[in-house]
């Protein structure tokens, strides 16, 4: 099975790709859509650093910009996938019907399959599976009650997951970040030949939300 992986650099898209690898599927391409503004379909945090991720995975990266208008961003994904010798596309959709159904629509038009192995999985269980599989996941954006500036740059581990679980009970924070509570960037995982080291990053904080903007990374042997 040959598939293209829709990658944002975040935990869900890369863990979905890891599951594909466990199935024995061949990931032939990474595909990244870069929105020019806030998008319902695509992530924007540190999207420029998918390139070293694809390099570490040893696969070519297909990038396409989009103005992030509802129908245009679908057409841009279709254009990015056209002509690929693949059987399907894998994505990290967990709960967004908007995202999942639109990817399925594009795949149907292209005559390929859409795979969403994380769909409706328990968020806490997924995080623990990721950590157990060797994923090093940094939190790079927060926007929720209980998630202060100190969370920016934090690596998700068992203690972090326990805290997210408590915040879920107290403030209804989605443990997976599916409501936009937080965004992530994967520094290392079994898909990488080399891990990523952040050499320069800048924090921004305003009115209860913030980002960790990555400015420079380097690859390091494991």
Residue ranges of model-derived segments:
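Nucleotide-activated chemistry modules centered on ATP-dependent adenylation/adenylyltransferase
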Residues: 1-222
């Amino acid at each position: 099975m040959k598939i293209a992986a829709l990658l944002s650099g975040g935990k869900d898209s890369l863990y979905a790709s890891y599951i594909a690898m466990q199935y024995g599927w061949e990931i032939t391409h990474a595909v990244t859509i870069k929105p020019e503004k806030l998008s319902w379909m695509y992530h924007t945090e540190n999207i420029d650093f998918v390139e070293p991720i694809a390099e570490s995975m040893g696969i070519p990266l297909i990038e396409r910009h989009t103005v992030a208008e509802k129908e245009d961003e679908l057409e841009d994904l279709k254009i990015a996938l056209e002509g690929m010798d693949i059987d399907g596309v894998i994505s990290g959709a967990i709960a967004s019907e908007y995202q999942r159904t639109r990817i399925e629509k594009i795949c149907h038009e292209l005559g390929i399959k859409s795979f969403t192995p994380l769909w409706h999985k328990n968020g806490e269980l997924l995080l623990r599976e990721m950590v157990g599989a060797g994923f090093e996941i940094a939190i790079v954006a927060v926007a929720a009650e209980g998630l202060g500036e100190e969370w920016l740059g934090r690596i998700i581990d068992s203690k972090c997951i326990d805290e997210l679980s408590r915040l879920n009970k107290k403030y209804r924070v989605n443990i997976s970040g599916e409501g936009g509570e937080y965004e992530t960037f994967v520094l290392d995982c079994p898909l990488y030949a080399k891990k990523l080291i952040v050499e320069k990053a800048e924090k921004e904080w305003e009115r209860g939300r913030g980002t960790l903007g990555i400015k420079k990374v380097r690859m390091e042997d494991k």
